[in-house]
A protein has these predicted regions:
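Aromatic/acidic polysaccharide-binding cleft in carbohydrate-active enzymes
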Residues: 443-573
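C-terminal beta-strand-rich structural cap/linker in extracellular carbohydrate-active enzymes
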Residues: 634-662
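Cellulosome-associated attachment modules in secreted, modular CAZymes
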Residues: 661-722
């Protein structure tokens, strides 16, 4: 079909006059092939992260529910990112201040979204994970009664998509999981003690197969909630006044259980109260040696307890009963050896609990394990994932923004899809075919224009740049999935509602005024999902003429560690359509990624529909601040065409009511009128278009040679004739 469209455009261009060519160059013309078909957009592609550390006041209010409902979410990722690796959903049910699992179930139900759950890989067992699947999905009366007791709902929640942990190949996850990752990671001990190198091949193997590990020493802080204390791999506790009275204390280590036997634990009891003010000042003055100094202070020889002074108990906790009495606020560090099941065992237990669920792994096994680790391929055949998890955050947007390369930021989405996602999926398909396992899809469960963290973030990211990028990411993923370019199982924007303006969120909550404010990202998402959120047309069912080309710059890195800035051409407009055949409305979405020019748009109604008198137009635009605006207007029907101007860096939607035509499109495929449609008809028609005079190009005889004529041309050989 795409070849046909290109040929039609070429033939049309040959026959058109110079005046018409000038008109086409100034206006982008869009039409649809008659008798087009709709493609359903999966709910799982319309996802948003709404994390469990959200204050309940942010989400439990009518304004937020209305805003959330307006974007038509398909899934809500819960409980979150890094901290989800050790999230205790049962304990958090007692926390009425935050969005716990009970409140999340109610919130998802109120906006008609499914929950996409991130399992606490860092602390769970296969049995616990399977129990949660049963609790949320099993219709058995036993689980129905438990749901009623815990969540005030008896029907199954129906959680289909499950992630086994979050970013566990990363070095910033060691404080939330029994094992994490990082390239060239060293675990450090006391000064002058040789550090332990933990290569990715080792940590990835532990992640999948499980095994024994010592939680001992410390790892460098790497952000995402790590500090000088939790970056120590052991568990630190302070003795209480009651512990002092009792002369002993019991500690349940964070990533236990401890393997039985005192040889599997090392306990340090600091012999004096630590001056935390002095420690803080030392870290401010000497940050590069701060962690080492703190560990040396705690794990000093005089603080080491004799194995007779503690007992590893049957449940994997430890009882400490030192001969030197405990005192209040005494710092205790327990280092320990523990055993954990890996992703394979957890996945298998969950699949037994509910074979219909889809489970994703968060570490790409092809990098260090496939065809390399003993037994890995065989085990992967037994325990394959349904999808691999990807978090496509950008790392060069500030550079582009500082130099005014704004269109380039928008086209990062193209680069992700065509240069990363499609090749990655093609590689996965090859692996799956070789192993004879079902195809593995992709899950893009966190993404945004920029992840700013707690630091300053350019205000433009909260304005139209963030909105337009969000619109590009959602819509391009929808279209890639519809056109069978990608198998996307999940796509979740990061994130939902939060306070402050440094992180990039859909909505901001003002704690002073207790109000909810939309952002350009939430408005863009609403507009996209109103038009193509549930169904859309395939790319080949649109006829697009004169999509303006932008000359863009990109940095290319070469194998010899050199780089260069090169130029390339890209279409300025992203164009998507849907046909609401229930309400008889044609929908058009235009993303103008051009950072310097507005562009004129003309949309022609297919010949099998009669357009309404006017159509509804909405435009989201803004400048390089956090300020943005939406403007609504109506566009008049002129000969079944609708025209408007899309401002630079804008999101536009056009909703056109129509009446199905009582007469079908003209059928002239039997061009030579010999009673049959044959190749000769096509050749005769091409000859007609290629002549130098008397060309029949105005096929609908309306006095103009427009896209509608090409549509009739298309019905001759590409469309259906009744």
């Amino acid at each position: 079909m795409k070849r046909t469209l290109n040929l039609l455009y070429l033939v049309f261009a040959i026959c058109a006059s110079n005046d018409l060519l000038a008109q086409v160059l100034n206006t982008t013309e869009i039409s649809l092939i008659p008798h087009h078909t709709q493609h359903d957009v999966p709910n799982a592609l319309r996802g948003v992260n709404q994390t469990a550390n959200s204050n309940i006041n942010w989400t439990d209010n009518t304004a937020f529910i209305d805003e959330f409902t307006a974007i038509n979410p398909g899934t809500m990722r819960f409980p979150g990112g890094t901290f989800a690796n050790s999230y205790d959903w049962e304990l958090e049910l007692n926390n009425s201040n935050n969005l716990n699992l009970k409140e999340a179930i109610a919130l998802a139900d109120s906006v008609d979204a499914e929950i996409n759950y991130v399992i606490n890989y860092g602390t769970t067992t296969p049995e616990e994970a399977a129990d949660l699947v049963h609790l949320l999905n099993d219709p058995d009366p036993i689980y129905a009664a438990q749901r009623q007791l815990l969540f005030d709902v008896s029907d199954p929640i129906g959680v289909k998509h499950w992630e086994l942990g979050n970013e566990l190949a990363a070095k910033w996850e060691w404080h939330v999981s029994w094992v994490a990752g990082g390239y060239n990671l060293n675990i450090y001990y006391q000064t002058n003690v040789t550090p332990l190198n933990m290569p990715r091949a080792m940590t990835d193997n532990l992640h999948y197969f499980g095994g024994d590990i010592w939680r001992k020493g410390w790892v460098p802080m790497a952000g995402d909630g790590m500090n000088q204390i939790n970056s120590m791999l052991g568990t630190i506790k302070k003795a209480t006044a009651q512990d002092e009275i009792d002369g002993e204390m019991n500690i349940d280590v964070e990533f236990g259980p401890i393997l039985l036997g005192v040889e599997n634990a090392i306990v340090w009891a600091v012999d004096a109260v630590i001056d935390e003010t002095a420690i803080a000042q030392d870290c401010e003055d000497y940050p590069e040696i701060c962690q080492q100094n703190i560990y040396d202070l705690i794990a000093a020889p005089q603080n080491l307890l004799d194995p007779s002074e503690y007992t590893v108990q049957a449940d994997g906790t430890i009882s400490i009963h030192p001969t030197t009495p405990l005192f209040e606020d005494q710092t205790i560090l327990v280092e320990y050896k523990t055993h954990h099941a890996g992703a394979f065992d957890i996945r298998d237990a969950m699949k037994i609990a509910d074979p219909t669920i889809e489970i994703g792994y968060c570490i790409d096994f092809r990098t260090h394990l496939l065809d390399t680790a003993p037994g890995f391929n065989t085990r992967l055949q037994i325990s394959p994932p349904d999808f691999l998890i990807e978090h496509p955050y950008n790392d060069s947007t500030d550079l582009f923004l500082n130099y005014g390369y704004l269109s380039e930021i928008m086209h990062m989405v193209d680069e992700y899809i065509y240069e990363k996602f499609i090749p990655k999926e093609a590689g996965l398909d090859i692996t799956c075919a070789a192993l004879e396992i079902p195809e593995i899809g992709l899950a893009l469960t966190e993404w945004n224009i920029r992840l700013c963290g707690p630091g300053d973030c350019h205000q433009a990211y909260n304005g139209i740049l963030g909105g337009l990028y969000t619109a590009n990411f959602f819509s391009q993923c929808y279209q890639a999935e519809a056109d069978d370019l990608l198998d996307i199982r999940l796509s979740n924007h990061f994130a939902g509602i939060a306070t402050g303006f440094n992180l990039i969120h859909m909505w901001h909550y003002n704690t002073t005024t207790q109000t909810v404010s939309p952002t350009a990202q939430s408005e863009a998402t609403r507009m996209v999902n109103e038009v193509i959120g549930e169904y859309m047309l395939h790319s080949e069912e649109m006829v697009i003429e004169n999509n303006p080309m932008s000359t863009l710059d990109r940095q290319v890195n070469y194998p010899d560690d050199t780089s260069a800035i090169i130029q390339y051409e890209a279409e300025a407009l992203k164009i998507y359509t849907s046909d609401d055949t229930i309400n008889n409305v044609l929908n058009l979405l235009i993303l103008n990624n051009d950072d310097s020019l507005a562009h004129n748009i003309q949309f022609a109604i297919p010949c099998d529909r009669i357009g309404g008198v006017d159509a509804d137009l909405e435009i989201l635009s803004g400048d390089l601040t956090e300020l943005f605006s939406t403007e609504a207007s109506t566009i008049q029907n002129v000969s079944d065409t609708y025209s408007f101007t899309a401002p630079m860096l804008s999101v536009s939607t056009l909703k056109i009511p129509y009446t199905p035509s009582s007469t079908s499109c003209a059928c002239m495929a039997d061009y030579n009128e010999n009673g049959s449609v044959e190749t000769v008809d096509f050749l005769d028609l091409l000859s007609e278009y290629g002549c130098t005079s008397n060309c029949i190009t105005d096929l609908n005889a309306d006095g103009n040679i427009l896209v509608s004529d090409i549509l009739i041309f298309l019905t001759f050989f590409g469309g259906l004739c009744p």
